[in-house]
From Swiss-Prot:
It comes from Cryptococcus neoformans var. neoformans serotype D (strain JEC21 / ATCC MYA-565) (Filobasidiella neoformans). SUPFAM superfamilies: Nucleotidyltransferase, PAP/OAS1 substrate-binding domain. It is an enzyme of class 2 (transferase). Residues 1-123, 482-762 are annotated as: Disordered. Its main location: nucleus. InterPro entries: MTPAP-like_central, NT_sf, PAP_assoc, Trf4-like. GO terms for cellular component: nucleolus; TRAMP complex. PANTHER family: INACTIVE NON-CANONICAL POLY(A) RNA POLYMERASE PROTEIN TRF4-2-RELATED (PTHR23092:SF15), POLY(A) RNA POLYMERASE (PTHR23092). The keyword Secreted does not apply. Component of the TRAMP complex. This is Poly(A) RNA polymerase CID14. Residues 572-581, 753-762 have a biased composition (Polar residues). Its EC number is 2.7.7.19.
Length: 762
């Protein structure tokens, strides 16, 4: 099926790009601006200089013959070794410039050498064995199931987890033997449990006698201790870096290990990230996908210009925090991972404004202006991500290759979209022909996989995972640590943590909307173009009276943040009012200057609300004003999201006896209670409200003053008489409906269904 997408293989493919054609002496002469050395070969029709003749005599007849046939066919004379070398360098520069030009246009040039090309060809999608394709209703479900299957597949098994745990314990015992008072703490991907099969282990050593002056000497001692303990045979000491570390690869399992000294901020960052991950379902799956995607393209290291794990985690968290449908709790992220992954690639690969906008995940997440913080630094193309621990620190400022990363993410968006269209066409064709159950089973997973178009498992990864499993089964590390085989490692390990629990919902069991938080119920007659414009904080009414009891019951936990608690997280649930953007009052003046506001359809503050009747309210305003403060529009319930006309348009009414002084400034006066079974039902729309008012109202209503007198009298009727009580109830209901009808036409301008502004009576 022809699609509107360009072939995305040119963006992230692994095919070798064709080299540009050689332009001969034309490129050479243009690069030198018309100047040539005396030793150069003369152009056609130009006389040879004396120096060239002498050179020919010295070099003999051997050099006077043509060097190779292609040059002879092109009419070019023989070339010397020096000229050949110059031509090769020139061709290399031309290829390099073309590759740079392609990158600037959004085209990645594929593998950089034959080894990378071979690795790309060896990739396959073994996680597809965990996907039941026949139960997927559409390609989006298929992609979501693939993401969950990939997450399960790359997550560590019990054997792999314990090998890493025992390796950390072995290194810890070696360090404690060298420095008995030192404290070793793992952090990074081990702390968040977001490491890949070939991921490294980050450790920090804290000691009260460690200082910056003796760090280099202590790192050398630490490296020597690692070699003597047969943990590794080669240690690299990076002492002049901003964070001095030692790096080595373990002999058992070939695991990369980084050890730093007295860097406690890494441990704190891991604790903060774990809080975010617990509050954002689906974040772990997306983070592992993006990390693996960048890792296979050598774009996961900051020192090479790529994005580090910390930056990737913050990007995914920010994406989930600010996603409109997640802010309104309309979808379950874990059942819509396929859509979210494509939208993530689209945002940071096509639409994100890297030049002007920075990312912050603090206080619910927001975007800010880079210029307001002085983060332009002459390189506006760099990605800026605020450190959750320090708002003045840019954790992604060192990723100088972000433009190539952006092009790669954009290519992934194009390729995944194209594969979705292909699978949709194939599913539709199979459904029409009745071959659904057999068509997919006859194919290999690599053939129908959507996610396999942008990533895959290499043989090198499989080999290392098998090696870790073999080490565990043979008990090599058990023997070194004196741990019995099959025993629970908790009593024998200092930095013990339980293995991760891998549990993800399946769209084949629930469907995308079954177990998701129920979306707000919308009226069928509501203006559809307004849906989706309301943010979570739209229906939060601000109170002038700080003593309002209702205000504390629905205020966002993010808005209660103080400067002493820079990271406050409230898990987003269907019944909670966690906001994705903190109000300006909770952000300092210096911080709020650069915050980019998210456009709202109207001002939701109670202070700026216009009185009823001044202008025709919008559909959204009607809904916000109609909801009482103690009830959330997003809370589960039958009538959630419906406009209660009796609350939206009713003017203040006299309180019942005994209820004086019980009304707050923000709450509307309650109506007289009706007997059981006669409660008013919620109205879906304005037309429904008007139709009911006109249908149930009597035609003998008097003036407004008369109604008020009769109503006051009806309240004071003696309850001993049933007949008088019924009569008073009827009068009270007529008065209420008359008030409703008057307020309704006052709000609407009184010009609908033949009514005029002056014709408000019956």
């Amino acid at each position: 099926m022809p699609t509107g997408f360009q072939p995305a293989e040119s963006f992230i493919s692994f095919g070798q790009p064709a080299s540009p054609p050689y332009k001969g002496n034309e490129a050479s002469s243009s690069s030198r601006k018309g100047k040539r050395k005396a030793s150069d070969t003369p152009a056609p029709g130009e006389k040879q200089t004396k120096k060239n003749k002498k050179d020919k005599k010295k070099k003999g007849s051997k050099k006077s013959q043509p060097v190779d046939e292609p040059d002879k066919k092109d009419g070019l004379p023989g070339l010397s070794k020096k000229q050949k070398k110059a031509l090769k360098e020139q061709e290399h520069k031309a290829r390099k410039s073309d590759r740079k030009r392609d990158n600037s246009r959004g085209i990645e040039a594929g593998p950089r050498n034959k080894k990378e090309e071979q690795k790309a060809a060896e990739r396959h999608a073994p996680w597809t064995e965990l996907v039941d394709v026949d139960l997927c209703r559409d390609p989006v479900d298929l992609l979501t199931e693939e993401i969950n299957a990939f997450y399960k597949y790359v997550s560590p098994t019990r054997e792999e987890f314990e090998v890493r745990l025992f390796m950390i314990e072995l290194i810890t015992r070696t360090i404690n033997k060298l420095w008995p008072e030192a404290e070793v703490t793992p952090f990074g991907s081990w702390q968040t449990q977001l490491y890949l099969p070939q991921g490294d282990i980050d450790l920090v050593v804290a000691h009260k006698y460690l200082s910056d002056a003796n760090k280099q000497r202590l790192l050398a001692e630490l490296g020597k201790a690692m070699r003597q303990a047969n943990i590794t045979d080669v240690v690299a000491i990076i002492a002049r870096a901003r964070v001095p570390i030692i790096k080595f690869v373990t002999l058992e399992g070939k695991i990369n290990v980084d050890i730093s000294l007295n860097q406690a901020n890494g441990v704190t960052a891991g604790k903060i990230i774990n809080q975010y991950l617990d509050a954002l379902p689906g974040a772990r799956q997306l983070i592992l996908i993006v990390k693996y995607f960048l890792s296979q393209r050598s774009m996961n290291e900051v020192y090479t210009g790529g994005l580090g794990s910390y930056s990737v985690i913050c990007m995914v968290i920010s994406f989930l925090q600010l996603h409109p449908k997640l802010r309104r709790s309309e979808i379950n992220p874990e059942l819509n991972l396929g859509t979210l992954l494509i939208e993530f690639f689209e945002l940071f690969g096509r639409n994100f404004n890297y030049n002007d906008v920075g990312i912050s995940i603090r206080r619910g997440g927001f975007y800010f202006s880079k210029a307001s913080r002085g983060w332009m630094k002459g390189q506006s193309f760099l990605l800026s991500i605020e450190d959750p621990q320090d708002k003045d620190n840019d954790i992604s400022g060192g990723s100088f290759g972000i433009r190539q990363v952006r092009n790669t993410l954009g290519g992934a968006y194009e390729l995944l979209s194209m594969r979705l269209f292909e699978r949709a066409e194939e599913m539709s064709r199979n459904a029409r022909s009745g071959r659904r159950s057999t068509s997919w089973k006859d194919k290999e997973g690599d053939d129908w996989s959507i996610l396999g178009g942008v990533m895959g498992i290499t043989k090198e990864t499989l080999k290392q995972r098998n090696e870790l499993t073999r080490i565990h089964l043979e008990g090599r590390l058990h023997h070194k640590l004196s741990i019995p085989l099959g025993a629970d490692p908790k009593p024998f390990v200092q930095n013990y943590r339980p293995p991760p629990i891998i549990s993800v919902p399946s769209v084949t069991d629930h469907g995308r909307g079954a177990s998701s938080p129920p979306p707000p119920a919308e009226s069928s007659k509501r203006n559809k173009k307004d849906v989706g414009a309301i943010m979570v904080e739209d229906d939060e009414l601000e109170s002038d009276d700080d003593s309002d009891s209702d205000a504390s019951s629905y205020s966002s936990s993010d808005s209660d943040d103080s400067d002493s608690d820079p990271v406050a997280i409230s898990p987003r649930t269907a019944n909670s009012r966690s906001t994705s953007r903190v109000p300006r009052a909770d952000i300092s003046d210096t911080e709020s200057d650069g915050i980019i506001e998210i456009s709202q359809p109207f001002e939701s503050s109670g202070r700026g609300r216009k009185p009823l009747g001044d202008s025709e309210p919008s559909e959204d305003e009607i809904e916000v004003l109609s909801n009482p403060p103690e009830e959330s529009r997003y809370a589960g319930g039958k009538g959630r999201g419906k406009a209660k006309v009796k609350d939206a348009f009713r003017p203040p009414t006299p309180p019942l006896p005994g209820q004086e002084g019980q009304l707050s400034d923000l709450s509307r006066p309650p109506t007289p209670p009706l007997p059981p079974g006669e409660e008013e039902e919620e109205i879906d729309s304005d037309e429904e409200a008007l139709r009911r008012i006109l249908a149930e109202s009597d035609g003998d209503l008097g003036s407004e003053d008369e109604i008020g007198k009769e109503w006051q009298g009806a309240i004071q009727v003696d309850s001993d008489s049933d007949e008088e009580e019924k009569k008073g109830r009827k009068k009270r209901k007529r008065g209420v409906r008359s008030e409703e009808r008057r307020a309704f036409w006052a709000a609407k301008g009184g010009n609908r269904l033949g009514q005029s502004s002056g014709d408000m009576s019956d």
